[in-house]
């Protein structure tokens, strides 16, 4: 049947549209039911219903499939309604820092700079993909603003600010199949180079200090794969963080940046810098971009600018304008090809002005969410032209479609605190929800970025280092104040970082296998327990632990002073990494967690060669 409504009588003015999705799929652990139809109801004084048939779904095996319909409304708004079954849980919607299960929340599908905010409604990288524990996913093909209201127990209400909304219903025999179908629709993630899943150290302060720190790390036997030098300025490309670091330390001196990078390459290290999509008045490139019309204007200004970083302002490159993109890509190619960088933090991308006038002719409300996608695509294309398959551009912002252009993600700017919404407690929800949504390669800022009450807290730094080491990328961040606790604070912190770096290095062959799988299938490296055990009702409730692939279970400690924590082990036999004890799963246990140990379990029979705990050289405690 046509996806346009069959008119039985001329209705009154249509104000919105609602889709009701009744019993889309069988509950994974319950009775199998075949859905009959998708119903579209106009909200107007005349009741008008049109039934749109779904593809046949076989209850016997719940086969994979995608059913697509386009919902249209005469108003600039489409509303969808999902009926919710008892016990049904929802996940996804991009990187989120609140509870992993989205039930009970009001969320916005709008890319925003969270800047350490505590609300879960906002996201650096939202995506309009909702996964249900009943065995289906719903992907909305739009960059318009969407509100997801999951506060009611019996329904989910979705409001999209658009007159036309393609809706993709994705089904499969298990959640993994649904995630794989979604990944193939939005774009499979590219495979990063091997070093991209390694141990990175953030270094600043100029050539001499960087080289001295590299020597110190080598003397401590830290297995280093890459250094990230974000204050290394390159005027030709505009790369580098051009402001004071930590409020007191100015950008370092790099008189021969290509020479320094070549020297670090000779020591087996990849070198990353820093880029963003902005042009800053008074700095190189701004006048040329303005004269050529590459910067986004608004009705009120020939070039839109907004305050940024101390006394500076920033303007946005128009990524909908092909010649502007080509000009910007020349700068990226210069940084990678001529200067020699191997990648960069791909920062920002969330703030494209909604009143901007874009070359594509699209309104800013449509361009806003698409901006980080275009930004990522442009950077990826330039990198591939110079160093195909050899670079990592690790991004903060994203939207549906940027998954295909990003070889690394960080979780944004957390506070140095134990806070569950803005500090260390927000990291795992961000990585898990982002992984469900199609971004598999996560490396959070070890110890966070913004100042907080934990800036001098060694225990907090240690717990963050442990979580970073058991992430796809182990990378630290120096933060936003002059002297936070860090790798070089004392002999104990250096030994802790070195020990967990050795553990991460031992995991690298396994992580690379998982990354190859992700690039082929879209399955994430960091996984909720229910992805491996969808028939286990307890697994669907666990939000504070995760699986690396199928064989490693990690239970981070994110509570100050905790020396033990409950851990749910899925079915099977599990080895406690620290004690060697073999534990039968499908049950809760109480795990010991002294300060220097993160609860860590390896599935019996896993093909992993991990170092003995005693060889890590961790401090006592």
Language-model-derived ranges and their functions:
Residues 10-31:
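Secretory targeting and sorting signals
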Residues 610-611:
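An acidic, gly/pro-interrupted, aromatic-rich
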């Amino acid at each position: 049947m046509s996806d346009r409504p069959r008119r039985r009588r001329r209705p009154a003015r249509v104000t919105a549209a609602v889709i009701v999705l009744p019993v889309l799929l069988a509950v994974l652990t319950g009775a199998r039911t075949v859905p009959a139809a998708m119903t579209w109801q106009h909200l107007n004084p005349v009741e008008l219903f049109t039934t749109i048939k779904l593809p046949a779904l076989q209850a016997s095996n719940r086969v994979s499939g995608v059913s697509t319909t386009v919902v249209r409304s005469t108003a600039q708004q489409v509303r969808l309604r999902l009926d919710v079954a008892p016990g049904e849980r929802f996940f996804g919607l991009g990187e989120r820092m609140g509870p992993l299960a989205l039930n009970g929340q009001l969320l916005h599908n709008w890319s925003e700079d969270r800047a350490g905010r505590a609300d879960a409604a906002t996201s650096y990288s939202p995506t309009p993909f909702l996964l249900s524990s009943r065995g289906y996913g719903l992907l909305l093909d739009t960059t318009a603003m969407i509100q997801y209201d999951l506060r009611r127990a019996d329904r989910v209400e979705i409001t999209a600010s658009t007159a036309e909304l393609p809706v993709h219903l994705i089904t499969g025999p298990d959640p993994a199949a649904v995630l794989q179908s979604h990944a193939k629709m939005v774009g499979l993630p590219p495979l990063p180079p091997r070093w991209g899943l390694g141990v990175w150290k953030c270094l600043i302060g100029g050539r001499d200090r960087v080289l001295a720190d590299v020597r110190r790390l080598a003397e401590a036997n830290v297995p280093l794969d890459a250094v990230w030098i974000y204050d290394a300025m390159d005027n030709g490309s505009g790369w580098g963080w051009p402001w004071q670091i930590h409020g007191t330390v100015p950008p370092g001196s790099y008189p021969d940046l290509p020479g320094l990078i070549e020297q670090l390459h000779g020591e087996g290290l990849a070198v990353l810098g820093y880029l963003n999509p902005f042009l800053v008045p008074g700095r190189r490139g701004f006048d040329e971009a303005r004269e050529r019309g590459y910067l986004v204007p608004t009705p009120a200004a020939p070039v839109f600018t907004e305050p940024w970083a101390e006394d500076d302002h920033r303007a946005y490159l128009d990524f909908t304008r092909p010649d502007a993109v080509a000009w910007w890509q020349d700068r990226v190619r210069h940084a990678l090809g001529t200067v020699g960088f191997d990648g960069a933090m791909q920062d920002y991308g969330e703030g494209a002005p909604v009143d901007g006038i874009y070359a594509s002719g699209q309104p800013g409300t449509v361009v806003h969410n698409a901006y980080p996608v275009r930004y990522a695509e442009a950077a990826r294309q330039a990198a591939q032209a110079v160093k195909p398959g050899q670079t990592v551009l690790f991004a903060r912002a994203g939207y549906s479609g940027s998954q295909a252009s990003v070889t690394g993600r960080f979780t944004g700017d957390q506070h140095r605190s134990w806070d569950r919404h803005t500090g260390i407690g927000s990291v795992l929800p961000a990585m898990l929800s982002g992984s469900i949504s199609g971004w598999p390669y996560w490396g959070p800022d070890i110890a966070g970025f913004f100042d907080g009450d934990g800036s001098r807290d060694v225990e907090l730094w240690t717990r963050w280092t442990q979580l970073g080491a058991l992430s796809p990328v182990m990378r630290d961040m120096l933060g936003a104040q002059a002297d936070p606790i860090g790798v070089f604070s004392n002999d104990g912190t250096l030994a802790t970082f070195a020990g967990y770096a050795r553990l991460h290095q031992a995991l690298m062959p396994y992580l690379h296998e998982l990354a190859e799988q992700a690039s082929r299938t879209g399955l994430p490296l960091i996984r909720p327990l229910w992805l491996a055990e969808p028939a286990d009702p307890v697994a669907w409730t666990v939000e504070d632990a995760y699986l690396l692939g199928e064989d490693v279970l990690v239970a981070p400690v994110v509570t100050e002073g905790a020396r033990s924590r409950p851990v749910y082990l899925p079915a099977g036999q599990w080895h406690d990494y620290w004690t060697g004890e073999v534990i039968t799963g499908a049950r809760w246990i109480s795990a010991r967690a002294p300060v220097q140990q993160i609860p860590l379990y390896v599935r019996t029979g896993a093909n992993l060669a991990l170092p003995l705990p005693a060889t890590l050289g961790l401090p006592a405690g």
